[in-house]
Amino acid sequence: MSTVELTQELTLALSVKDRAKASQWYQTHLGFNEVVSIDEAGWTEMTTNVPGVTLGLGDTDEVSPGNCVPVFGVKNVAAARKALEDVSVKFDGDTMTVEGMVSLATFYDPDGNALMIAEDLSS
């Protein structure tokens, strides 16, 4: 049995210099659709043609290749975080919440790769 139970949702988070330009590129070339863009959060989400997989575009001043961070959906981010911390998984800072949207936390695998867990607060 796994430490946490994941939902059937996965967000691939990419850092981009220009979210509007990046969104248009993904729409034009890959057929993705923009579903939400929140300027205050510096975040845009797009549906992909893969069920349960969302592309997230986050603002950054400097992009470095290979910056993809998988964001795994969970039913309760606080419970999932506690379960992972209980088995010594390292987290980066506090859990962040954007009211009415998402609650998320960043953690690391044994090689230092960043991963995230996220609870959907929109419903």
Give the role of each language-model region.
Residues 1-5, 14, 81, 85-123:
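Vicinal oxygen chelate
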Residues 20-22, 38-44, 97, 123:
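Short glycine/proline-centered loop/turn elements that form peptide/ligand docking sites
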